[in-house]
Amino acid sequence: MPLRLDIKRKLTAMSDRVKSVDLHPTEPWMLASLYNGSVCVWNHETQTLVKTFEVCDLPVRAAKFVARKNWVVTGADDMQIRVFNYNTLERVHMFEAHSDYIRCIAVHPTQPFILTSSDDMLIKLWDWDKKWSCSQVFEGHTHYVMQIVINPKDNNQFASASLDRTIKVWQLGSSSPNFTLEGHEKGVNCIDYYSGGDKPYLISGADDRLVKIWDYQNKTCVQTPEGHAQNVSCATFHPELPIIITGSEDGTVRIWHSSTYRLESTLNYGMERVWCVASLRGSNNVALGYDEGSIIVKLGREEPAMSMDANGKIIWAKHSEVQQANLKAMGDTEIKDGERLPLAVKDMGSCEIYPQTIQHNPNGRFVVVCGDGEYIIYTAMALRNKSFGSAQEFAWAHDSSEYAIRESNSVVKIFKNFKEKKSFKPDFGAESIYGGFLLGVRSVNGLAFYDWENTELIRRIEIQPKHIFWSDSGELVCIATEESFFILKYLSEKVLAAQETHEGVTEDGIEDAFEVLGEIQEIVKTGLWVGDCFIYTSSVNRLNYYVGGEIVTIAHLDRTMYLLGYIPKDNRLYLGDKELNIVSYSLLVSVLEYQTAVMRRDFSMADKVLPTIPKEQRTRVAHFLEKQGFKQQALTVSTDPEHRFELALQLGELKIAYQLAVEAESEQKWKQLAELAISKCQFSLAQECLHHAQDYGGLLLLATASGNASMVNKLAEGAERDGKNNVAFMSYFLQGKLDACLELLIRTGRLPEAAFLARTYLPSQVSRVVKLWRENLSKVNQKAAESLADPTEYENLFPGLKEAFVVEEWVKETHADLWPAKQYPLVTPNEERNVMEEAKRFQPSRATAQQEPDGKPASSPVIMASQTTHKEEKSFQELEDDLDTMELEDIDTTDINLDEDILDD
């Protein structure tokens, strides 16, 4: 079976001919040197050109990143080496390195060295710490030296490829080569070392259209993959995947298996000749340079081959080497969230295939390794081979002794105790299979679930899943697609009933087999169930869990991580990254158990679990209860005063809210509680809350609405004392305390307003106020001050002033005449009264008003809200006079029925 290798193009950068490419080790950058003399830096994540260096007018055949110095080093046909700072774009250094075209640059991984090769047949070593002095010259080739590469397993050794048809291996410090490899019939263009520890191999490509694999210890050619139709211009071992990548002037890039040397894939992007290739350890990205530009492709899946059993034993594959680590061995080591765990790694041996996935069975006794179209089942303890076979895919059942394989796109086989139990062909083929309580088979038509026992169709769903995750109980299942995930409930009782009665069974299976609980628009990368809580990592690098329709974020991850498992006794969740680093995050099992019990409405169990939840986690649980609609329980559980106060308000719990407000001493809380108290008609509590909140406006509203005169009086004094002058003024005004209103305006410097108030209500004070106003205004504008007229000096400008004095006296003497509220219907409204007329009939001897014989209150000046009077009745003579002067047209007849004959007359 072929190697399963996903290939995705990430970047296409059109440009002039590309002579070399390089990838930055930490930034998402690709460096491309061009035949036109420019060097470009592309961001392959944003697909944008981020930097350009105009090097010279001649081809730049070599360019490399020196990340630890923030440099780009270039070599061109003008024989110059140039060093640029890629942050500032400044040229740091420039020197002539060779007497002919510079073909290649190699950067030493640890020392301050670069190696350069040239058409002058020389290789030179340069030390940038010694002002770029030439430390050594390597002579021996008799033609152009096309490429040099440093041995990743021995940094003092490097190899060179030349058009003299040879490959030479050199040692730093020695000017002559260690040995020479010969075998190509034409010039050798490219060379690379195998970075794995298991094989001492070199690869070379030449103008004879051949690729050769060399054992540099035995100095022999071990393989010659054939297939290119033109000169082979580049060749490399991928540092992570078991593949060889070669590029040719025939326009194709060929991918070969590095163990079997089988051709796995051929890429042709139609960009003419291929000139260069670059890959990077720790990344699946590969950069390719063509005549018409450059391309970055992503090969394979970045998810590591890694698995953890329920006891904390982790197995992973590093290339073909299988290693193990045990979380128990950490003992009582303090673990911090998100920090790499200091695990002791144990080598378990080598795997016969290149592992692409590793997965424990449910009880952890066995582990399956899949790759190269094959699977091998090992014992988890000693890595002993238990079973093997060919398969495109493998899936464990919930029963640890049972599993399924997808033999082809049409055949699925089920095994029990390592023996084939059943083979069947799904109706619409099998593109992928999924394990768990039911066997899931994806086809072009959707997803079908089958019974493991008899392969009977349970339900067909029109959905294209990427992953399927079953809970331990088998009641819940998560189906993750490209854009979202669904939470379904498996109704096993209804399935059993339908299988017995054959009711509700259609061609798509049992209709009531599943109940959809929710759909969430988020992409699941990896996931697992703990009880009824689904924990997952998302496409935006968040670690979340879903329970009861609520998504809780556990952590924001700084890189892509993959879930390994959850250890309840540790209360920790474990994840790994593609570099095989293990990290952990705290997640209390008691919290998950409580939430699971609530979701199942098992409140007796929830009450038993609650005491085991630490206090610092209670508020998280309370938020969950609130979202589930159990606010009363949330109020009991929560330990956060803010949250409890909000819940108390929502539930109308005045006592609890009052206690929390006293503890918090927050004006905002007192205002919120006052609103609730008013809505509950608890006016005394509302008054206290408003006092605590110093909400004078609210107190005024409450006092006036309830008709509490003493409260208005106290409020006026308190508001004035605290500088709340508007409220104080209104409180005095509502009580009819005009003198206090006037003095308040004067004290606060509101003299114009005081003058108008005096003119309207207290004419006896107007002269004093105008004098004060004039004195104050003269400090700013003398002319304006002189233009102010005192009403007592210019009575002609203020008509009715004398009458106003009389009214004022009348008001003062009758102001104390207040009437009971029950007489309100008998009182004439202020807008219908004529105070001047009432004051004319006023006699000082009647200052103390008496009840009139008809029971109506005597006349009194109702200028303020606290003053009342009755409607004034006209005398008989006044009515006679009114009738004499009335015209017929003045009579309103809208509500009177008149005889039409009379109207006609």
UniProtKB/Swiss-Prot annotation:
Residues 878-905 have a biased composition (Acidic residues). Pfam families: B-prop_COPA_B_2nd, TPR_COPA_B, WD40. InterPro entries: Beta-prop_COPA/B_2nd, Coatomer_complex_subunit, COPB2, G-protein_beta_WD-40_rep, TPR_COPA_B, WD40/YVTN_repeat-like_dom_sf, WD40_repeat_dom_sf, WD40_rpt. GO terms for biological process: endoplasmic reticulum to Golgi vesicle-mediated transport; intra-Golgi vesicle-mediated transport; intracellular protein transport; retrograde vesicle-mediated transport, Golgi to endoplasmic reticulum. SUPFAM superfamilies: WD40 repeat-like. Residues 867-891 form a coiled coil. It is a peripheral membrane protein. SMART domains: WD40 (SM00320). It comes from the Eukaryota. The keyword Protein transport applies. The coatomer is a cytosolic protein complex that binds to dilysine motifs and reversibly associates with Golgi non-clathrin-coated vesicles, which further mediate biosynthetic protein transport from the ER, via the Golgi up to the trans Golgi network. Coatomer complex is required for budding from Golgi membranes, and is essential for the retrograde Golgi-to-ER transport of dilysine-tagged proteins. This coatomer complex protein, essential for Golgi budding and vesicular trafficking, is a selective binding protein (RACK) for protein kinase C, epsilon type. It binds to Golgi membranes in a GTP-dependent manner. PANTHER family: COATOMER, COATOMER SUBUNIT BETA. Belongs to the WD repeat COPB2 family. This is Coatomer subunit beta'. It comes from Rattus norvegicus (Rat). The gene is Copb2.
